[in-house]
């Protein structure tokens, strides 16, 4: 990668971010900066804290659909009418096979299930799958299992896994995307997980009609919570979801590539020493501008997502190499 020479204004932002002296007004003002300046600042911070590496992760939709929650963006919600495959929890053999299929590319593998939480029987089976993956691959294991209780979190801590629980958006905007559970339900799980000693991955989705203020408030909450890995998605509206209808009617404007890249940069500047991980929707929103996201992020989800297909893994590896990054 080329060496970055920051102009005086960009250098001031870089130094304030690195020393954690940026306030909320500073972050709001970032939106008005030129994208190239934001990318330069982000890349300088990335080099300072996380070097020229991209951490790769993959997920498996281990239980799909018929979710009782009413998240307007999710094709797995029974409140939406998307046509997707639905199935109960996959066997440990199927989960292990999926993990092994991405082992040569990914550093992390996450078991993801639909629903507000898991049953006791499902949890026992997931623990068995975690053990299988840890014993038979070199992958680090993550799980996304909804709103877990203290005993479940303690059991997962004993298995040395990372927990994923997305806040999705700001506290103020959350009621616009889901009403069957609230923001504080998620906060409680994250706080309990951190208290127990678990690594935590959390983040949100850009493009659901939220404001720039909402995105910044999300970043500040993630910072306050001490989340280890920040998972950021770009909305790929799926036919049959409530949000697809709202975008199609013009009620919500879809996020564009410039807005997405600026948001990723502001996440980096707000959380300079955290892993910023770009996940679903990047192919749909960024298209041929995906490569520029690598200047702001240091984690990338590869392979397929929960109910949509991802970019060819070889294309991702080529993109990373051509941009001069390691994995």
Swiss-Prot record:
Recorded superkingdom: Archaea
Biochemical pathway: Cofactor biosynthesis; biotin biosynthesis; biotin from 7,8-diaminononanoate: step 2/2
A Gene Ontology biological process term: biotin biosynthetic process
Reactions listed under catalytic activity: (4R,5S)-dethiobiotin + (sulfur carrier)-SH + 2 reduced [2Fe-2S]-[ferredoxin] + 2 S-adenosyl-L-methionine = (sulfur carrier)-H + biotin + 2 5'-deoxyadenosine + 2 L-methionine + 2 oxidized [2Fe-2S]-[ferredoxin]
Record has Iron-sulfur as a keyword: yes
Cysteines paired by S-S bonds: none
Cofactor (UniProt): [4Fe-4S] cluster; [2Fe-2S] cluster
Class of this enzyme: transferase
Keywords annotated in UniProt: 2Fe-2S, 4Fe-4S, Biotin biosynthesis, Iron, Iron-sulfur, Metal-binding, S-adenosyl-L-methionine, Transferase
The EC number(s) this enzyme carries: 2.8.1.6
Record domain Radical SAM core: where: 49-282
Residues annotated as binding [4Fe-4S] cluster: 67, 71, 74
PROSITE patterns, A to Z: RADICAL_SAM
Family annotation (InterPro entries): Aldolase_TIM, BATS_dom, Biotin_synth/BioAB, Biotin_synthase, Elp3/MiaA/NifB-like_rSAM, rSAM
Role of this protein: Catalyzes the conversion of dethiobiotin (DTB) to biotin by the insertion of a sulfur atom into dethiobiotin via a radical-based mechanism.
PANTHER family in the cross-refs: BIOTIN SYNTHASE, BIOTIN SYNTHASE, MITOCHONDRIAL
Family, similarity comment: Belongs to the radical SAM superfamily. Biotin synthase family.
Protein name from the UniProt record: Biotin synthase
């Amino acid at each position: 990668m080329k060496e970055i020479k920051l102009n005086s204004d960009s250098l001031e932002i870089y130094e304030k971010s690195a020393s954690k002296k940026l306030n909320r007004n500073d972050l709001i003002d970032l939106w008005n900066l030129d994208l190239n300046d934001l990318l330069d600042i982000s890349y300088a911070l990335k080099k300072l804290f996380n070097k020229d590496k991209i951490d790769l992760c993959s997920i498996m939709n281990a239980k799909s659909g018929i979710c009782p929650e009413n998240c307007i963006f999710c094709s797995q919600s029974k409140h939406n009418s998307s046509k997707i495959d639905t199935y109960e929890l996959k066997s440990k053999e199927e989960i292990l096979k999926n993990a092994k299929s991405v082992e040569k590319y990914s550093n992390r593998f996450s078991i993801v299930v639909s629903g507000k939480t898991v049953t006791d029987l499902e949890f026992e089976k997931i623990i068995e799958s975690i053990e299988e993956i840890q014993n038979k691959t070199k992958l680090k294991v993550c799980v996304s299992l909804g709103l877990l209780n203290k005993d479940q979190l303690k059991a997962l801590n004993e298995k040395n896994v990372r927990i994923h629980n997305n806040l999705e958006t700001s506290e103020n905007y959350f009621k616009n995307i889901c009403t069957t559970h609230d923001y504080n339900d998620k906060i409680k799980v994250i706080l309990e997980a951190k208290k127990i000693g678990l690594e935590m991955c959390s983040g949100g989705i850009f493009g659901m009609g939220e404001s720039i203020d909402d995105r910044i408030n999300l970043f500040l909450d993630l910072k306050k919570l001490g989340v280890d890995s920040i998972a950021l998605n770009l909305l790929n509206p799926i036919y049959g979801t409530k949000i697809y209808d709202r975008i199609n009617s013009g009620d919500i404007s879809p996020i564009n590539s410039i807005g997405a890249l600026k948001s990723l940069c502001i996440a980096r500047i707000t959380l300079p020493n955290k892993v910023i991980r770009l996940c679903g929707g990047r192919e749909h929103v960024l298209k041929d501008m995906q490569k520029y996201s690598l200047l702001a992020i240091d984690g990338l989800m590869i392979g397929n997502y929960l109910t949509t297909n991802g970019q060819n893994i070889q294309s991702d590896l080529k993109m990373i190499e051509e941009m001069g990054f390691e994995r």
